[in-house]
Protein backbone atom coordinates (compact mmCIF):
# COMPACT_ATOMS: atom_id res chain seq x y z
CA UNK A 1 0.00 0.00 0.00
CA UNK A 2 1.29 3.45 -0.97
CA UNK A 3 0.50 6.25 1.47
CA UNK A 4 1.38 9.95 1.29
CA UNK A 5 1.64 12.00 4.49
CA UNK A 6 1.29 15.79 4.35
CA UNK A 7 2.26 17.85 7.40
CA UNK A 8 3.71 21.35 7.92
CA UNK A 9 6.52 19.72 9.90
CA UNK A 10 7.60 16.29 11.08
CA UNK A 11 9.91 17.38 13.89
CA UNK A 12 9.66 19.01 17.30
CA UNK A 13 9.00 18.05 20.91
CA UNK A 14 5.27 17.64 20.40
CA UNK A 15 2.31 18.43 18.20
CA UNK A 16 0.74 16.89 15.14
CA UNK A 17 3.90 16.81 12.99
CA UNK A 18 5.89 14.50 15.27
CA UNK A 19 2.72 12.40 15.66
CA UNK A 20 2.65 11.97 11.87
CA UNK A 21 6.33 11.05 11.81
CA UNK A 22 5.91 8.39 14.53
CA UNK A 23 2.99 6.82 12.67
CA UNK A 24 5.00 6.78 9.42
CA UNK A 25 7.90 5.04 11.18
CA UNK A 26 5.63 2.34 12.61
CA UNK A 27 3.80 1.75 9.32
CA UNK A 28 7.11 1.36 7.51
CA UNK A 29 8.21 -1.18 10.12
CA UNK A 30 5.25 -3.40 9.23
CA UNK A 31 5.63 -3.12 5.48
CA UNK A 32 3.71 -0.05 4.33
CA UNK A 33 5.26 2.35 1.82
CA UNK A 34 4.86 5.79 3.41
CA UNK A 35 6.09 8.92 1.64
CA UNK A 36 6.46 12.20 3.57
CA UNK A 37 5.76 15.34 1.56
CA UNK A 38 8.07 18.19 2.58
CA UNK A 39 6.83 21.67 1.75
CA UNK A 40 8.72 24.96 2.29
CA UNK A 41 7.06 27.90 4.02
CA UNK A 42 7.78 31.53 4.84
CA UNK A 43 9.02 31.62 8.48
CA UNK A 44 6.92 34.63 9.48
CA UNK A 45 4.12 34.15 12.03
CA UNK A 46 1.11 35.19 9.93
CA UNK A 47 2.48 33.68 6.71
CA UNK A 48 3.60 30.20 7.81
CA UNK A 49 0.37 28.27 7.23
CA UNK A 50 -0.69 30.38 4.24
CA UNK A 51 2.64 29.91 2.46
CA UNK A 52 2.71 26.20 3.36
CA UNK A 53 -0.74 25.67 1.82
CA UNK A 54 0.11 27.73 -1.26
CA UNK A 55 3.51 26.17 -1.98
CA UNK A 56 2.14 22.73 -1.15
CA UNK A 57 -0.79 23.12 -3.52
CA UNK A 58 1.60 24.01 -6.34
CA UNK A 59 3.71 20.97 -5.47
CA UNK A 60 0.60 18.80 -5.30
CA UNK A 61 -0.59 19.88 -8.74
CA UNK A 62 2.73 18.78 -10.22
CA UNK A 63 2.59 15.38 -8.48
CA UNK A 64 1.24 12.91 -11.05
CA UNK A 65 1.26 9.87 -8.75
CA UNK A 66 -1.90 8.15 -7.56
CA UNK A 67 -1.76 6.91 -3.97
CA UNK A 68 -3.88 4.41 -2.11
CA UNK A 69 -4.22 6.91 0.75
CA UNK A 70 -3.34 10.56 1.23
CA UNK A 71 -3.25 11.51 4.91
CA UNK A 72 -3.24 15.24 5.70
CA UNK A 73 -2.19 16.28 9.18
CA UNK A 74 -3.84 19.54 10.31
CA UNK A 75 -6.21 21.79 8.39
CA UNK A 76 -3.66 23.71 6.25
CA UNK A 77 -2.54 20.36 4.81
CA UNK A 78 -6.06 19.74 3.48
CA UNK A 79 -5.54 22.26 0.67
CA UNK A 80 -2.68 20.11 -0.60
CA UNK A 81 -4.52 16.84 0.04
CA UNK A 82 -7.34 18.05 -2.21
CA UNK A 83 -4.95 18.28 -5.18
CA UNK A 84 -3.38 14.82 -4.82
CA UNK A 85 -4.85 11.82 -6.62
CA UNK A 86 -5.75 9.00 -4.23
CA UNK A 87 -8.34 6.35 -3.53
CA UNK A 88 -8.88 7.65 -0.01
CA UNK A 89 -8.28 10.96 1.76
CA UNK A 90 -7.82 11.27 5.52
CA UNK A 91 -7.59 14.50 7.53
CA UNK A 92 -6.38 14.45 11.15
CA UNK A 93 -6.53 17.38 13.56
CA UNK A 94 -5.19 18.14 17.02
CA UNK A 95 -7.58 20.70 18.48
CA UNK A 96 -10.31 22.82 16.91
CA UNK A 97 -8.44 24.79 14.28
CA UNK A 98 -10.60 27.94 14.23
CA UNK A 99 -10.33 28.17 18.02
CA UNK A 100 -6.53 27.95 17.82
CA UNK A 101 -6.47 30.67 15.14
CA UNK A 102 -8.60 33.00 17.28
CA UNK A 103 -6.25 32.60 20.24
CA UNK A 104 -3.10 33.21 18.19
CA UNK A 105 -4.37 35.80 15.71
CA UNK A 106 -7.71 37.65 15.82
CA UNK A 107 -11.46 37.12 15.89
CA UNK A 108 -11.66 38.45 12.33
CA UNK A 109 -9.16 35.88 11.07
CA UNK A 110 -10.88 33.19 13.12
CA UNK A 111 -14.23 34.19 11.64
CA UNK A 112 -12.88 33.73 8.13
CA UNK A 113 -11.47 30.31 9.04
CA UNK A 114 -14.71 29.28 10.78
CA UNK A 115 -16.79 30.19 7.72
CA UNK A 116 -14.66 27.85 5.56
CA UNK A 117 -13.79 25.16 8.10
CA UNK A 118 -16.78 22.89 7.50
CA UNK A 119 -16.28 23.00 3.73
CA UNK A 120 -12.58 22.12 4.08
CA UNK A 121 -13.45 19.16 6.30
CA UNK A 122 -15.71 17.85 3.52
CA UNK A 123 -12.67 17.32 1.29
CA UNK A 124 -11.70 14.28 3.38
CA UNK A 125 -13.28 10.85 3.25
CA UNK A 126 -12.33 10.23 6.88
CA UNK A 127 -11.76 12.71 9.72
CA UNK A 128 -9.79 11.79 12.83
CA UNK A 129 -8.71 13.44 16.07
CA UNK A 130 -6.63 12.28 19.02
CA UNK A 131 -8.98 13.84 21.58
CA UNK A 132 -12.52 12.98 22.68
CA UNK A 133 -13.08 16.61 23.67
CA UNK A 134 -12.17 17.78 20.16
CA UNK A 135 -14.36 15.04 18.70
CA UNK A 136 -17.32 16.35 20.73
CA UNK A 137 -16.61 20.02 20.01
CA UNK A 138 -16.44 19.48 16.25
CA UNK A 139 -19.66 17.44 16.39
CA UNK A 140 -21.43 20.37 18.07
CA UNK A 141 -19.76 22.95 15.83
CA UNK A 142 -20.06 21.30 12.41
CA UNK A 143 -22.17 18.18 12.86
CA UNK A 144 -19.30 16.11 11.47
CA UNK A 145 -18.07 12.84 12.89
CA UNK A 146 -14.39 12.51 13.74
CA UNK A 147 -12.98 9.08 14.43
CA UNK A 148 -11.17 9.01 17.77
CA UNK A 149 -7.63 7.86 17.02
CA UNK A 150 -5.20 8.39 19.92
CA UNK A 151 -1.55 9.19 19.32
CA UNK A 152 0.42 6.13 20.50
CA UNK A 153 3.47 6.18 22.73
CA UNK A 154 6.38 4.22 21.28
CA UNK A 155 7.97 2.69 24.37
CA UNK A 156 11.03 1.50 22.47
CA UNK A 157 12.15 5.12 22.04
CA UNK A 158 12.76 5.35 25.78
CA UNK A 159 15.34 2.55 25.89
CA UNK A 160 18.15 5.10 25.52
CA UNK A 161 16.78 7.37 28.28
CA UNK A 162 18.54 5.55 31.13
CA UNK A 163 20.65 6.33 34.18
CA UNK A 164 19.17 9.77 34.72
CA UNK A 165 19.42 11.11 38.25
CA UNK A 166 16.65 13.19 39.80
CA UNK A 167 17.35 16.88 40.35
CA UNK A 168 15.57 17.78 43.59
CA UNK A 169 12.96 20.54 43.27
CA UNK A 170 13.32 20.68 39.47
CA UNK A 171 10.18 21.30 37.42
CA UNK A 172 9.95 20.78 33.65
CA UNK A 173 8.02 22.67 31.00
CA UNK A 174 8.00 20.98 27.59
CA UNK A 175 6.33 22.61 24.61
CA UNK A 176 6.32 25.52 22.22
CA UNK A 177 7.13 29.03 23.37
CA UNK A 178 3.66 30.13 22.38
CA UNK A 179 0.76 32.00 23.99
CA UNK A 180 -1.74 29.14 23.80
CA UNK A 181 0.67 26.92 25.74
CA UNK A 182 0.57 29.28 28.75
CA UNK A 183 4.35 29.47 29.07
CA UNK A 184 3.99 33.14 30.04
CA UNK A 185 1.91 32.10 33.05
CA UNK A 186 4.60 29.74 34.30
CA UNK A 187 7.28 32.38 33.79
CA UNK A 188 5.17 34.86 35.74
CA UNK A 189 5.07 32.62 38.84
CA UNK A 190 8.58 31.18 38.48
CA UNK A 191 10.00 33.31 41.31
CA UNK A 192 7.29 32.01 43.68
CA UNK A 193 8.07 28.35 43.05
CA UNK A 194 10.14 26.58 45.70
CA UNK A 195 12.38 25.08 43.06
CA UNK A 196 13.79 25.67 39.59
CA UNK A 197 12.04 25.47 36.21
CA UNK A 198 13.66 23.97 33.11
CA UNK A 199 12.03 25.31 29.95
CA UNK A 200 12.37 22.81 27.08
CA UNK A 201 11.02 24.65 24.05
CA UNK A 202 13.42 23.81 21.26
CA UNK A 203 15.62 20.89 22.30
CA UNK A 204 16.13 17.51 20.62
CA UNK A 205 13.71 14.85 21.85
CA UNK A 206 16.38 12.74 23.60
CA UNK A 207 17.70 15.71 25.55
CA UNK A 208 14.19 16.85 26.43
CA UNK A 209 13.27 13.42 27.78
CA UNK A 210 16.41 13.29 29.94
CA UNK A 211 15.50 16.64 31.48
CA UNK A 212 11.92 15.48 31.97
CA UNK A 213 13.00 12.25 33.64
CA UNK A 214 15.34 14.17 35.95
CA UNK A 215 12.51 16.47 37.09
CA UNK A 216 10.21 16.16 40.08
CA UNK A 217 7.19 17.02 37.92
CA UNK A 218 5.94 18.28 34.57
CA UNK A 219 3.79 21.42 34.46
CA UNK A 220 1.40 21.95 31.53
CA UNK A 221 -0.11 25.47 31.91
CA UNK A 222 -1.93 25.55 28.55
CA UNK A 223 -4.84 27.82 27.66
CA UNK A 224 -6.05 25.33 25.04
CA UNK A 225 -4.99 21.78 24.20
CA UNK A 226 -5.81 18.64 22.32
CA UNK A 227 -3.90 15.73 23.90
CA UNK A 228 -0.33 16.71 24.81
CA UNK A 229 2.07 13.91 23.92
CA UNK A 230 4.43 15.13 26.63
CA UNK A 231 1.91 14.14 29.31
CA UNK A 232 2.02 10.58 28.00
CA UNK A 233 5.81 10.73 27.97
CA UNK A 234 5.87 11.98 31.56
CA UNK A 235 3.48 9.21 32.59
CA UNK A 236 5.77 6.59 31.06
CA UNK A 237 8.83 8.11 32.75
CA UNK A 238 6.94 8.16 36.07
CA UNK A 239 7.10 11.94 36.34
CA UNK A 240 4.02 13.45 38.07
CA UNK A 241 1.99 15.98 36.09
CA UNK A 242 0.16 19.19 36.96
CA UNK A 243 -1.95 20.39 34.02
CA UNK A 244 -4.70 22.88 33.33
CA UNK A 245 -8.24 21.57 33.04
CA UNK A 246 -8.61 22.36 29.32
CA UNK A 247 -9.17 20.41 26.11
CA UNK A 248 -8.01 16.82 26.29
CA UNK A 249 -5.85 17.20 29.41
CA UNK A 250 -8.55 15.64 31.66
CA UNK A 251 -8.64 12.60 29.36
CA UNK A 252 -5.16 11.81 30.68
CA UNK A 253 -4.84 13.61 34.00
CA UNK A 254 -7.47 12.33 36.40
CA UNK A 255 -7.40 14.75 39.32
CA UNK A 256 -5.62 13.34 42.37
CA UNK A 257 -5.31 9.96 40.66
CA UNK A 258 -2.91 10.28 37.72
CA UNK A 259 -1.97 13.89 38.49
CA UNK A 260 -3.31 17.31 39.42
CA UNK A 261 -5.70 19.50 37.40
CA UNK A 262 -5.90 23.27 37.91
CA UNK A 263 -8.06 25.96 36.28
CA UNK A 264 -6.60 27.67 33.23
CA UNK A 265 -5.09 31.13 33.72
CA UNK A 266 -5.10 30.87 37.52
CA UNK A 267 -1.46 31.57 38.46
CA UNK A 268 -2.11 31.55 42.21
CA UNK A 269 -3.72 28.12 42.16
CA UNK A 270 -0.99 26.79 39.89
CA UNK A 271 1.89 27.91 42.11
CA UNK A 272 0.11 26.57 45.20
CA UNK A 273 -0.34 23.12 43.66
CA UNK A 274 3.26 23.06 42.40
CA UNK A 275 4.69 23.89 45.82
CA UNK A 276 2.34 21.47 47.59
CA UNK A 277 3.37 18.61 45.30
CA UNK A 278 7.06 19.46 45.67
CA UNK A 279 6.60 18.94 49.42
CA UNK A 280 4.64 15.68 49.10
CA UNK A 281 6.84 12.80 47.97
CA UNK A 282 4.17 10.18 48.66
CA UNK A 283 1.64 11.92 46.41
CA UNK A 284 4.22 12.25 43.64
CA UNK A 285 4.99 8.54 43.87
CA UNK A 286 1.29 7.53 43.85
CA UNK A 287 0.43 9.73 40.86
CA UNK A 288 3.47 8.48 38.96
CA UNK A 289 2.64 4.81 39.54
CA UNK A 290 -1.03 5.26 38.60
CA UNK A 291 -0.11 7.20 35.48
CA UNK A 292 2.44 4.60 34.38
CA UNK A 293 -0.19 1.87 34.60
CA UNK A 294 -2.73 4.03 32.75
CA UNK A 295 -0.44 4.86 29.83
CA UNK A 296 0.64 1.25 29.28
CA UNK A 297 -2.95 0.07 29.35
CA UNK A 298 -4.32 2.64 26.90
CA UNK A 299 -1.71 4.25 24.65
CA UNK A 300 0.96 1.77 23.58
CA UNK A 301 1.39 0.60 19.99
CA UNK A 302 0.40 -2.87 21.20
CA UNK A 303 -3.05 -1.47 21.96
CA UNK A 304 -3.45 0.98 19.07
CA UNK A 305 -1.69 -0.45 16.00
CA UNK A 306 -4.75 -2.31 14.76
CA UNK A 307 -6.80 0.90 14.87
CA UNK A 308 -4.29 2.56 12.55
CA UNK A 309 -4.05 -0.31 10.08
CA UNK A 310 -7.85 -0.50 9.97
CA UNK A 311 -7.93 3.22 9.16
CA UNK A 312 -5.84 2.71 6.02
CA UNK A 313 -7.16 -0.69 4.96
CA UNK A 314 -10.91 -0.20 5.39
Q: Where are the predicted features?
A:
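Carbohydrate-associated surface elements
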Residues: 133, 152
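Conserved donor-binding/catalytic core segment of Leloir-type glycosyltransferases
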Residues: 164-181, 187-190
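Conserved acidic donor-binding segment of nucleotide-sugar-dependent glycosyltransferases
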Residues: 255-256, 260-267, 276-281
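A short, well-ordered alpha-helix in the C-terminal region of glycosyltransferases
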Residues: 269, 276, 283-298, 304-310
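Membrane-proximal helix-turn-helix segments that form the acceptor-binding/catalytic region
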Residues: 58-61, 108-127
